[in-house]
Regions:
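A cross-kingdom feature that marks ATP-driven nucleic-acid transaction machinery
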Residues: 3, 311-473
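Phosphate-binding site recognition
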Residues: 1-341, 345, 445
Length: 473
């Protein structure tokens, strides 16, 4: 088995399900290029009793042919190619029956949503296969994968049809953390420093396939130019494919993404509706929910006198999408664009914005550093409705032990200096927050920086300091 980087929890769970001694139906989902197929195939490669993969946008006849060829590979080479899905799953049933010897039989169907072409009868045949037979066979472990998250959620995970409550386990594959990204790059022979890893993570996110495209002979800037700004840049063309593979009617999702990309602070549901000129919010609710499920968007509560879920703020957090919409969507013919921006305010501003997003994606690591892993917390950003200009706090972690970590997030390539003016701004923000919310909890000023805070007369303001290294755990 090829070494699998990261995914420790997922490997433990899949191994546990394999040895459960009962029938298992596991749905693995997540964005395109996240490593779903890689994980399952590497973990169970010599244990498949049957496996096949759906083909994106192929007609029913082609999908059935692929299914039939897989049946031949694992069983009778003279097996007729099925012409409808009831025949296909009946043949699979007979194949598995012939293999039953009291040992686990792993059935893997990759890109399952692709098989559900219009009027093909796939869903009904699949439901009958599982509900009518496979669910009662203790040897069977059925694993299905899909990038089309909207289909996976609607038809499997939250199904109200024949597969309602039939899935025994769902498994969402999230992007890599900074630490997992570091481990992957080390395994590929990179000797990059953590600031370089943070910078590339700020652009690619923790998507394993994107990271696999990096060239260790180039630095961050050279890789970014090659992947985004060269004449045939691989990741410039990825954007449209990404959303069309994840969501049916992807245009609705991309419109929401484009609106959120235009507002750094995030937007309320009402503001999004106004921007898109929507009269009804039913579709928007579904779109936002699925974007959140895929880690493209986060919805965080707001706080006035109390924490309010009703007025949630939605913010684009997918780093690849954010970078694409900021620098590629407008378009440029400069093939060395990112190199030419080195050290300039536009690039530094980007890294500052992205570092805020990276911190939001590493709340568990921040909580671990603070020693509050087991304490219930609410986290959110805050914007004053009174002060002019409006005071804003990047991140607040409100804890059940009656303390609040008021976090200032600062990116720099050297220890951050708190000046007299910055000290005053932070103190004013704290005062505004306490006055407007009426919060009674103790406030702990917390600085999250790349290289710590430079020791000056104002450094004492940062009662807690969290550095970039503390996110790499």
């Amino acid at each position: 088995m090829e070494q699998i980087i990261g995914r420790k929890k997922e490997i433990e769970l899949l191994t546990e399900y394999y040895h459960s001694g009962k029938s298992e139906f596991v749905a693995v989902y997540g964005r395109r290029r996240i490593g779903k197929t890689y994980l399952v195939r590497n973990l169970f490669r010599d244990k498949f009793a049957f496996d096949m993969s759906g083909s994106i946008e192929a007609p029913a006849e082609a999908q059935l042919s692929n299914f039939g060829f897989a049946l031949r590979e694992y069983g009778d080479s003279k097996q007729p190619i099925p012409t409808k899905w009831t025949e296909a799953f009946e043949a699979l049933k007979q194949l598995l029956k012939a293999k039953m010897k009291g040992e686990r039989l792993v059935v893997f169907i990759d890109e399952l949503p692709c098989l559900d072409t219009p009027k093909s009868g796939f869903q009904q045949a699949f439901e009958h296969f599982w509900n009518g037979w496979a669910a009662y066979q203790s040897e069977i472990m059925l694993i299905v994968c899909g990038s089309a998250t909207s289909w996976m959620i609607a038809n499997l995970i939250d199904s109200h049809g024949g597969l309602h409550n039939r899935i025994t386990h769902e498994m969402y594959l999230a992007p890599f953390t900074l630490r997992e990204t570091e481990l992957m790059l080390q395994a590929y022979g990179f000797s990059w420093t953590r600031i370089s890893i943070l910078q590339i993570y700020s652009i690619l996110g923790g998507v394993p396939y994107y990271l696999s495209l990096l060239d260790k002979k180039q630095g961050v800037e050279g890789n970014v130019d090659r992947l985004f700004f060269s004449s045939h840049a691989e990741l410039k063309r990825e954007y449209g494919r990404l959303y069309s593979s994840l969501f049916r009617n992807s245009e609705a999702y991309m419109r929401v993404i484009e609106v959120l990309a235009s507002c750094r602070q995030g937007m309320t549901r009402k503001e999004i509706m106004e921007k898109l000129k929507l009269k009804s919010g039913g579709t928007l609710t579904k779109v936002l929910s699925e974007l959140i499920n895929c880690d493209f968007v986060r919805g965080y509560n707001t706080r006035d006198k109390k924490i309010k879920q009703k007025d949630q703020i939605f913010q684009l957090t997918d780093l690849y999408t954010l970078f694409y919409m900021t620098f590629c969507h407008p378009g440029t013919t400069d093939t060395g664009y990112w190199t030419h921006l080195m050290g300039k305010p536009r690039q530094n501003t980007w890294y500052g914005l992205a570092f805020e997003r990276v911190c939001m994606l590493h709340i568990p690591q921040i909580k671990h550093f603070l020693g509050i892993d087991q304490i219930h917390t609410e986290y959110y950003s805050w914007r004053s409705k009174v002060s002019k200009p409006a005071a804003q706090i990047d991140l607040l972690i409100e804890r059940a032990d009656n303390l609040v970590n008021l976090c200032e997030i600062k990116y720099s390539q050297m220890p951050y200096t708190i000046t007299k003016e910055e000290d005053m701004r932070i103190r004013n923000r704290m005062a505004d927050f306490v006055a407007e919310t009426g919060i009674k909890s103790g406030i702990i000023p917390t600085m999250i920086t790349t290289f710590g805070v430079r020791l000056t007369q104002y450094a004492a303001l940062a009662q807690v300091q969290i550095t970039m290294d503390d996110l790499f755990v």
